[in-house]
Amino acid sequence: MAGLDHIVHCTSAFDALRATMTGIGFTLTPPAEHPFGTGNSLIQLDGFFVEFVHLPNPHLVPQPKPDEFGFAAFNADYMKDGGEGVSMLVFESDDAAAEQARFVNAGLDTYQPFSFSRLARQPDGEDVTVGFSLAFATHADMPRA
């Protein structure tokens, strides 16, 4: 694990948050939708980014199996009852499977690594394919972190 890659910030006021961030001078990526119900927009900084996540398609949120971490389900649950703010810290890694093993050795609850790809529109309008391989860890003492 090399360091902090980005934070995930949940919001039910996605358009208003994007307008506020643009108004104070940030450039955001165009809104994108994930195939599992969530959508996002990013503020990309040098070596770090902020991911604003919302739930445009709650009917697409799958219920995770016991050994799976449900990114969409976790964030949908986080936003219940008005939950807003940083829901996740995401660290850099070149090897999700090795990170999962490290999490197990540290006594954290782990899940099967999760990989997906999607088209992403860049600020200049270009569409590129982006892909991710993720290892998730949770701990009972931190149910909302």
Give, region by region, the residue ranges found by the protein language model.
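Generic detector of short, locally flexible boundary/turn motifs and exposed helical patches
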Residues: 6-10, 15-19, 51-57, 111-115, ...
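Amphipathic alpha-helical segments
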Residues: 14-27, 99-106
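Vicinal oxygen chelate
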Residues: 2-13, 41-46, 49-51, 62-145
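N-terminal start-of-chain detector that recognizes signal peptides
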Residues: 1, 13-16, 23-25, 59-65, ...
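Glycine/small-residue-rich interface belts in oligomeric ring/scaffold proteins
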Residues: 18-78
